Amino acid sequence: MDNLIFSLNATIPVFLMMVLGMIFRKIGLFDEAFITKMNKFVFVVALPALLFEDIGSANFYEAWDTTYVLYCFGATLLSILISFFISIPFRKNVSQGEFVQAAYRSSAAIIGMAFVQNIYGDYGMASLMIIGTVPLYNVMAVVVLALLKPGQSRLTFALMKKTIKGIITNPIILGIVVGVIWSLLKIPTPVIVHKTVSLLAVLATPMGLMAMGAAFKFQGFSQNIKPIIVCSVMKLVVFVVLFMPFAIYLGFTESKLVAALIMLGSATTVSCYIMARSMGHDGNLTAGTVMLTTLGSAFSLTFWLYILKCLNLV
């Protein structure tokens, strides 16, 4: 019973914040313009500030774990390849690009940081998980949506240039890079700067979760039910079953294991829908997968955490 209570305490507050976002939109406190701006604020300001504070204030030499970062990178890359092969039977009826992106791309930054902080009181190894996944997420999302788009057979130079520029200027990646440099050089942070950054950083989790909930829409599920269900099962179950045993075998525990779980088995991020639409896909499969995985992950993540707690790994 104690293990179940631990799991519920870890997951319910996170999803309640998302539910609050949905409620606030429903009653008119959040409108579409505000939700868009809130998402942008979290992505451009609050989350980079959180990552900078977390990494910059740590001893990077002690915190860095090459094996863990490579594990996160490798598991993500293999997830993308598996998603591609599983998508082949559905390619006549749905966008392969949407299927692959929705199957592998998690809400790693927002939900990952929220879960680790909620359980351990700090952000622990979630930052290292983000280093191993977010750059690859962004690169491969553009590649699969471009190459696996109906009528598209190759990546153009302009598209690749735009992708590289997007990665270099990604605020989350910039926050990580500046934090790493700050930590490596052991630069002292003035009290005023530290408190200002901290105040911005604490906004990332609650605002990010509420923005995700507010952006959530019940659409797209009635079409393409079978591929949506397959995609969702892969996202919430299959990748966890395939790759978590390797994480345990490699000796990862506590915040590293929780961050890996979020990377593998959390809901498909809402930004997948935005990106799919912006690259010429209809977005229906993505919207349906976001809806189903968001609802399902409230139960699946609780279950996985319960299993890990019973094994005394978290």
Give each language-model segment a name.
Residues M1-V314:
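Alpha-helical transmembrane segments of multi-pass small-molecule/ion transporters
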